[in-house]
Amino acid sequence: TCKDAMNMKDFIKSLELSLPELEKMGEIGFAEGMSRVFVNRLNSLDITKRPIHCSDVKREIIHIKDDNKWERDNANLDRLRKIIKQLTHKNILRVDDWKKANPGCTEYNSRKNDQYLRINMEAIGPVDDGEVKRDFGKIIRRVAESTTIDKKYL
């Protein structure tokens, strides 16, 4: 069973976006970049240690462990959406680290400046309601697909 799974709060706290991952997000976009980071970190954990499981991919039935108990997310997946927002906030904080590691990125009309602007834009994520719905939907689908577990483990 998954009684030894880590709490989601601990998972979020431990997830640190690397500067190369931040650069990749600038290249491939928020939804794809966030999905990769989230899924790769989950996949690095033993399946019984993961703080999130999907029991039905088609219906996107998500179970999240926090405060040492498993709970099913609601139909709107509000908890998972909140987690994505928390991870997005961590991305934004890393942009300043990238800026410090790349002097000259604020010089107008340079390649590094173009890269810096793309990273900034993608790290922040979507702002338009339609884009938020689309991008979060993509991330949720990818997380659900990668965390599918047999119901007997829940």
Provide a role label for each language-model segment:
Residues T1-L154:
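Extended amphipathic coiled-coil helices
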